[in-house]
Amino acid sequence: MKAGIHPNYRTVVFHDLSADTYFKVGSTINTDRTIELEGESWPYVTLDVSSASHPYYTGKQKEFSKEGSTARFQQRFGRFFTGNK
């Protein structure tokens, strides 16, 4: 490997703000912020969404049949389409 052309790979602490969860992951992200965690100082990056807070991974997904655009259409105009012709 050539010296000086590769990014600095190191362990970084990612903090999911919405779930208040911390992850230690190897990354090449640049950050000047640090955090004291488990008695050591680590580079620190904040996240809005991660697997700890994303609806797909937490199982708190919305059902399209109840909350989708088709359901909204049925609520607004369903009375006009009662099936009587």
UniProtKB/Swiss-Prot annotation:
Gene Ontology cellular-component terms listed: ribonucleoprotein complex; ribosome
Domain of life: Bacteria
Gene Ontology molecular function terms on file: structural constituent of ribosome
Alphabetized SUPFAM superfamilies for the sequence: L28p-like
GO BP field: translation
Keywords: Ribonucleoprotein, Ribosomal protein
Residue ranges crossing the lipid bilayer per the database entry: none
InterPro entries reported for this sequence: Ribosomal_bL28/bL31-like_sf, Ribosomal_bL31, Ribosomal_bL31_B, Ribosomal_bL31_sf
UniProt xrefs under Pfam families: Ribosomal_L31
NCBIfam families, per database record: L31, PRK01678.1
Quaternary structure (record): Part of the 50S ribosomal subunit.
Family: Belongs to the bacterial ribosomal protein bL31 family. Type B subfamily.
Name of this chain's protein: Large ribosomal subunit protein bL31B
Annotated source species: Serratia proteamaculans (strain 568)
Gene: rpmE2
